Amino acid sequence: MRTFIAIDVNEEVKKQASEIIEKLMKRGFGATWVSEENMHLTLFFLGEVDEQKISEIAEHLCRRVRGFPSFSFTVKGFGYFKRKMSPRVFWLGVENTDRLMKLYEELRNELSHHGFSFEEKFVPHITIGRVKYYPDKWEKLIEDIDFPPIEVAVDRFKIYSSTLTPTGPIYKVLYECQFEGGLIRYA
């Protein structure tokens, strides 16, 4: 199954993000927009992993971060990744990431013991849309878009499955790892 590891964001972030998506749609941008229930900060995309292996990985990851102190990061700002001269992905920025980066490194080290390697640099962000089409002079149309700072408390991460459909991905929580409470298995 197609899997990834993520941190959920709070309702305030989801609400503000939805307002930005609405503005972008009204301004003529077309994208596969991320629904509120699917908004998250991806730590790792693992790809296809069989059920038995993901169970083992979840147990080891959770053991690795047991007792990790809870922390927060700030969601702030709006931006995009480009392909050539075109917007490819719209995202919300993430600041105050020292503890987030420590968590990322702990998980990355554990995942390396399970045969995973991650070559791309981790750039924390929250994807809100994968751009399909955009209007002329699109850069002018997003100059005034910003995201006010919102703090997100973190005391756990989740492992999700992702099923791709014509209307967008369907995410399902498989495991939740609470820093103080241990592993919770869904499914």
From Swiss-Prot:
One of its GO terms (cellular component) is cytosol. InterPro entries: Cyclic_Pdiesterase (IPR009097), RNA_CPDase (IPR004175). A motif (HXTX 2) lies at residues 125-128. It catalyses: a 3'-end 2',3'-cyclophospho-ribonucleotide-RNA + H2O = a 3'-end 2'-phospho-ribonucleotide-RNA + H(+). Keywords: Hydrolase. One of its GO terms (molecular function) is protein kinase A regulatory subunit binding. This is RNA 2',3'-cyclic phosphodiesterase.
